[in-house]
UniProtKB/Swiss-Prot annotation:
GO terms for cellular component: external side of plasma membrane; plasma membrane. It is a single-pass type I membrane protein. The keyword Signal applies. Glycans are attached at N79, N96, N117. Monomer. Homodimer. Homotrimer. Interacts with MARCHF1; this interaction antagonizes MARCHF1-mediated MHC II and CD86 down-regulation. Residues 60-81 are annotated as: Disordered. This is CD83 antigen. Keywords: Disulfide bond, Glycoprotein, Immunoglobulin domain, Membrane, Signal, Transmembrane, Transmembrane helix. It comes from Homo sapiens. The chain crosses the membrane at residues 145-166. It is found in: Membrane. Induction: Strongly up-regulated together with costimulatory molecules such as CD80 and CD86 during dendritic cell maturation.
Length: 205
């Protein structure tokens, strides 16, 4: 098979691949993330959820035991509560969502023998959080804020320099005036006294 044909088949497969489903939820509300992995209702899978982070790292969210055996799992998380409810098998319920919960999640189903793993991804978008609004506002006015800070620093530096210069001007003129007065004083030698010089009289014989 030629390389061009391989690239064509890969592009076709990529275009036909199903897009990752996306779930949107308002801030502070609960959300139920479905596991998009294909599964057999007759097989009691064990499910695990991970959140995909930047750099390829993964963080375990809520490990879940067999749903089909009627087990229920609940965990308190830092950014909310995570449930593994029985209403929707293998789903992940996140309570009290925040902006930190936004991201891509992946569920993995493992059969009892541990020989086959099925996985699926879902994207969660949490909107309307106060922290998110502040971040968007900062990004919108970031250039103006940076310019304002630069102007404030410039004027503070100018004021400090002016105050220091005025202080130096108020101190040093006294020394310069005294130096000028000393420069114009007459210099006299302590060993020599000034007096009238009288010529000696000579008598003619």
């Amino acid at each position: 098979m030629s390389r061009g044909l391989q690239l064509l088949l890969l592009s076709c497969a990529y275009s036909l691949a199903p897009a990752t489903p996306e779930v949107k939820v308002a801030c502070s509300e609960d959300v139920d993330l479905p596991c998009t992995a294909p599964w057999d209702p007759q097989v009691p899978y064990t499910v695990s959820w991970v959140k995909l982070l930047e750099g390829g790292e993964e963080r375990m969210e809520t490990p879940q035991e067999d749903h089909l055996r009627g087990q229920h799992y609940h965990q308190k998380g830092q950014n909310g509560s995570f449930d593994a409810p029985n209403e929707r098998p293998y789903s992940l319920k996140i309570r009290n969502t925040t902006s930190c919960n936004s991201g891509t999640y992946r569920c993995t189903l493992q059969d009892p023998d541990g020989q086959r793993n099925l996985s699926g991804k879902v994207i969660l978008r949490v909107t309307g959080c106060p922290a998110q609004r502040k971040e968007e506002t900062f990004k919108k006015y970031r250039a103006e804020i940076v310019l304002l800070l630069a102007l404030v620093i410039f004027y503070l530096t100018l004021i400090i320099f002016t105050c220091k210069f005025a202080r130096l001007q108020s101190i040093f003129p006294d020394f310069s005036k005294a130096g000028m007065e000393r420069a114009f004083l007459p210099v006299t030698s302590p060993n020599k006294h000034l007096g009238l010089v009288t010529p000696h009289k000579t008598e003619l014989v």
